[in-house]
Amino acid sequence: ANPRPQMIGNLEAGDLIVLDLFAESRPQWGDPASTWYRKDGFGQHDWIYCMLLNYGGNVGLHGKLKHVIDEFYKAKESPFGKTLKGVGMTMEGSENNPVMFELLTELPWCPQRFDKDQWLREYTVARYGKSNPTVQDAWILLSNSIYNCPDANTQQGTHESVFCARPTEHPYQVSSWSEMKDYYDPNDVIRAAAMMVSVADEFKGNNNFEYDLVDIVRQAIAEKGRLTEKVVEAAFAAGDKKLYKDASDRFLRLILLQDELLATRPEFKVGTWIARARSLGGTPEEKELYEWNARVQITTWGNRLAADEGGLRDYAHREWNGILKDFYYMRWKTWFDYQTRLLDGKKTAAIDFYAIEEPW
């Protein structure tokens, strides 16, 4: 994927096909607007328009719905379009944001660019089996907010949930290299979730709807968590003990609420992840090893050197039932207790987060 020009310049056309690995954000096919612009693209070689979308398998609504449509047809209609041979998925983690993968795989079948909103209306009918104006409006609202990541934004996947962050005085991104930015109004997500909830009874038993409902409500709770955490920060800075306790308690309740919500779907349960890992083992020892690997991958990534100095802790974090209550809640409760002691004027040692993370 994305080979250097010197590597492919002397190869004959037809000898290879190149994957433009991150085409939805940093295309190299020859788009002058790209930060990874290559004047000659991939030369005479065939290439694939790929969407990376997700890093680390992190959970969260994210995408560039309109941009993916526009960028694909921009490439197709350019001089480089004659060697464009299809689309590809290069995500690090799947089983998230199905709307984006549905859109991507439909592009090659549509000879001309199409209207995003009309496509979404048809998508909801195909996905849920019937037309509902409220559902369609909810999805269009999402497409104009959290699924409307700016063209030039190169963040590594989802706008990460603050629940999953290792606590600090000013927590923002969860993984070390996410480069995420606040590009949408969280209240739009909260409104879209309320719209989906308002018609949920009409879709009872509809697996696709119920999956999306949980995922969208999950995102709304995460947005409320981020808004609440900002109140916690402000209360600590002001030395307001009462507000700090009220806001931090509310934040912890939101984590538990999120955990309870996600228990309703196997796709959002850490137990599903661990059970799958254990099922690959042929002996009791292998099962234990695979479970250990599954747990480490989504938390510390490895030893203290990898987690802290290497910055790899939480790279593959998951906002899932089970780990929210047993891991992320523990971290935040430890942090709030620590800051409460500081507000009370008590001397307290700095928290060794790795020491409390590793046993999980």
Map each language-model feature to its residues:
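Short, solvent-exposed, charged loop/turn and helix-capping segments
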Residues: 200-213, 261-277
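Catalytic-core regions of glycoside hydrolase
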Residues: 1-143, 148-150, 156, 164-186, ...
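C-terminal amphipathic alpha-helical "assembly" element
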Residues: 197-198, 204, 218, 233, ...
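C-terminal substrate/ligand-recognition segments
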Residues: 179-201, 215-237
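Extended, compositionally biased alpha-helical segments that mediate assembly or anchoring
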Residues: 320-360
